[in-house]
């Protein structure tokens, strides 16, 4: 399988600003994050809660994590999903990217669709998990997750709110 590159993704040009009233540091560098959109045969997708002690603790998101120096998105996603939720992924496709300006970090989320994996889900960081369909029933949803729910809704011709 070829390494996924950031240029393969469909990107949105704007940066979504979250909690705009909160202060930000001017010297923040862009943090690259690999995110897995795991989709079962019935169309359900996996959301996990952010662990205790992390920013936005308890918010629901797609699993993943930061790229380490020299890693591709695919390598980082494979490592993160093994470390965080105990699975080994098969093929993954870089699908979309989104830049989010949070008060604590400026991030580029690199979303990969994953339809093949092995192993049982084990939440190694104390988080919860839920297989969801649209509209999602878990709350609250992390702001960086909302665009993905909207993209899934477009692909599935889903009408209505994607989340509470």
Model feature map: region roles:
Residues 4-23, 162:
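Intrinsically disordered, low-complexity terminal tails and inter-domain linkers enriched
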Residues 87-97:
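A short coil-to-beta-strand element that immediately follows conserved catalytic motifs
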Residues 44-83:
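Conserved Nudix-box catalytic region and its N-terminal flanking loop in Nudix hydrolases
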Residues 113-115, 121-156:
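NUDIX/MutT-family hydrolases
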Residues 2, 88, 154-158:
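HhH-family (HhH-GPD) DNA N-glycosylase catalytic core used in base-excision repair
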Residues 14-45, 66, 97:
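Conserved N-terminal beta-strand and adjoining loop/helix that marks the start
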Residues 40, 98-121, 128:
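Active-site-adjacent beta-strand/loop module that shapes the phosphate/pyrophosphate-binding cleft
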């Amino acid at each position: 399988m070829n390494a996924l590159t950031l240029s393969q993704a469909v990107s949105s040009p704007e940066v979504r600003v979250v909690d705009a009233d909160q202060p930000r540091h001017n010297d923040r560098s862009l943090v690259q994050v690999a995110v897995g959109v795991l989709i079962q045969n019935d169309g359900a997708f996996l959301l996990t809660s952010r662990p205790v002690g992390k920013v936005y603790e308890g918010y629901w998101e797609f699993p993943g994590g930061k790229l380490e120096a020299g890693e591709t998105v695919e390598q980082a996603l494979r490592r993160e999903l093994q470390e965080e939720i105990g699975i080994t992924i098969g093929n993954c496709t870089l699908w979309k990217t989104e830049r989010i300006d949070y008060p604590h970090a400026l991030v580029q989320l690199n979303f990969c669709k994953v339809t093949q994996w092995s192993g049982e889900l084990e939440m190694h960081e104390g988080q919860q998990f839920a297989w969801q369909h649209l509209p999602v029933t878990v709350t609250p949803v992390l702001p960086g997750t909302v665009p993905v729910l909207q993209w899934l809704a477009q692909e599935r011709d889903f009408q209505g709110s994607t989340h509470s």
